[in-house]
Amino acid sequence: MAKKVAGQLKLQVKAGSANPSPPIGPALGQRGINIMEFCKAFNAATQEMEKGMPIPVVITYFQDKSFTFVMKQPPVSYFLKREAKVQSGSKTPGKAKAGAISKAQIRTIAEAKMKDLNAADIEGAMAMVEGSARSMGLEVTG
């Protein structure tokens, strides 16, 4: 018989640095999930990734207090900041530019994020990434 799902929890955790301190510990603890077991499993799954990369994770927990988790790709903003080599987006996106990013870089990001985006084709995914870049104050170049 299949396990009964008790709920789902969405978190964003830095790769290789899951630990029982807030916000992970309290979020898992109040649902009765073994915190250290999750931290060890997550850190093992992300050991090959760039340390500190923010990873969205969806944890499905069951009534018997066991759990499974699915890792997604890092947010588009992370990829954009990395490609444009900026620390953060513009404080005033319509007026001041934080940096520039090329269409080729946008295509690379869209290809990496394609499975997580709600887009039918690569052009649609590129349009979403381009919109995110503009809202961060990045100039999209040829």
Curated annotation (Swiss-Prot):
Recite the UniProt keywords alphabetically.
Answer: Methylation, Ribonucleoprotein, Ribosomal protein, RNA-binding, rRNA-binding
Enumerate the Gene3D superfamilies for this protein. Answer: Ribosomal protein L11, C-terminal domain (1.10.10.250), Ribosomal protein L11/L12, N-terminal domain (3.30.1550.10)
Q: Which GO terms describe its biological process?
A: translation
Q: Which InterPro entries match?
A: Ribosomal_uL11, Ribosomal_uL11_bac-typ, Ribosomal_uL11_C, Ribosomal_uL11_C_sf, Ribosomal_uL11_N, Ribosomal_uL11_N_sf
GO cellular component term of the entry, any: cytosolic large ribosomal subunit
Q: What post-translational modification does the entry describe?
A: One or more lysine residues are methylated.
Which GO terms fall under molecular function for this chain's record? Answer: large ribosomal subunit rRNA binding; structural constituent of ribosome
Q: What does this protein do?
A: Forms part of the ribosomal stalk which helps the ribosome interact with GTP-bound translation factors.
UniProt cross-references to PANTHER family, sorted A to Z: 60S RIBOSOMAL PROTEIN L12 (PTHR11661), LARGE RIBOSOMAL SUBUNIT PROTEIN UL11M (PTHR11661:SF1)
Family of this protein: Belongs to the universal ribosomal protein uL11 family.
Subunit text: Part of the ribosomal stalk of the 50S ribosomal subunit. Interacts with L10 and the large rRNA to form the base of the stalk. L10 forms an elongated spine to which L12 dimers bind in a sequential fashion forming a multimeric L10(L12)X complex.
Instruction: Quote the protein name from its UniProt record.
Output: Large ribosomal subunit protein uL11
Please tell me the species this chain comes from.
Sinorhizobium medicae (strain WSM419)
